[in-house]
Amino acid sequence: MNETMKSRFGKVAVMMGGNSCEREISLMSGQGVLNALRGQGVDAHAFDPAEKPLAALQSEGFDRVFIALHGAFGEDGTLQGALETMGIPYTGCGVMASAIGMDKWRSKLVWKAAGLPVPDFRLLADDSDFAAIEAELGLPMFVKPACEGSSLGVTKVRKAGELAQAYAEARKFDPLVLAEQFVGGGEYTVALLEGRALPAIKIEPATEFYDYDAKYFRDDTVYRCPAGMDDEHELAMRRLAEQGFAVLGGSGWGRIDFLVDEAGQPYLLEINTAPGMTTHSLVPMAAREAGLTYEALCLKVLEAAHVG
């Protein structure tokens, strides 16, 4: 342990694991962060809320929390609210931005109300007119749980009559289910650090779309950073990412995913307020392109820990 780092950050809990469907990914992210912080002399310790109560943060004398949890409880505002009441600084977005960002439906409503471009979408229910929605949004389309991450429960609907089955699959993960217009010009993501956009990344999945397997385990998913856009389109996407982040009240760091149409127009897809930090993760990739090592990125995120 480095005394300078001790005085700077105190005792740090790297919050990882948890009970969400994304536990496995969270453990990978958290271990990477833990190793990076310890390697720079930070007094960092693993903390799994599935194994011990949050009250242990106070009883064990932790001074700040690096949130490496994904999904429910970790990035939906619940944990953030608990840490606020304890007065313990934490990384990433606050309560409101985390809660809205976890909900793909409500975040799209906010972006749309702010005049920012989003793919057309519908909220589905048991009594929805699925045939009418297929006609309105067109095929193919995506169906996804509104409050689940890592593409869990996502289905690409290709043929008329398949929407009801896709809805039933998504309902296994969340009661709120979204149908979303397909935009076919490419998938991109933009990481944000301290409110500023990092270089965009183009995602070329080996699977038909960027699913759970492609995100975390396949080695044939192609990531291009620089993304290969001209300066005008790159800057426009970065600017839109910063706007989308600010409108939701984002702080610290995050990542916004985009779809681009055939004319090059970017559409805000969803926000990730507790991005992955695994070997396949995208924020570290964008940070490297901007001249930041993984270790430096972890320190920058930790430095921005806050209450309120």
Curated annotation (Swiss-Prot):
Its cofactor is Mg(2+); Mn(2+). It catalyses: 2 D-alanine + ATP = D-alanyl-D-alanine + ADP + phosphate + H(+). One of its GO terms (cellular component) is cytoplasm. This is D-alanine--D-alanine ligase. Binds 2 magnesium or manganese ions per subunit. The keyword Transmembrane helix does not apply. It comes from Laribacter hongkongensis (strain HLHK9). Its main location: cytoplasm. Residues 108-303 form the ATP-grasp domain. It is an enzyme of class 6 (ligase). Keywords: ATP-binding, Cell shape, Cell wall biogenesis/degradation, Cytoplasm, Ligase, Magnesium, Manganese, Metal-binding, Nucleotide-binding, Peptidoglycan synthesis. Its EC number is 6.3.2.4. GO terms for biological process: cell wall organization; peptidoglycan biosynthetic process; regulation of cell shape. Mg(2+) 2 binds at E270, N272. It comes from the Bacteria. InterPro entries: ATP-grasp, ATP_grasp_subdomain_1, D-Ala_lig_Van_CS, D_ala_D_ala, Dala_Dala_lig_C, Dala_Dala_lig_N, PreATP-grasp_dom_sf.
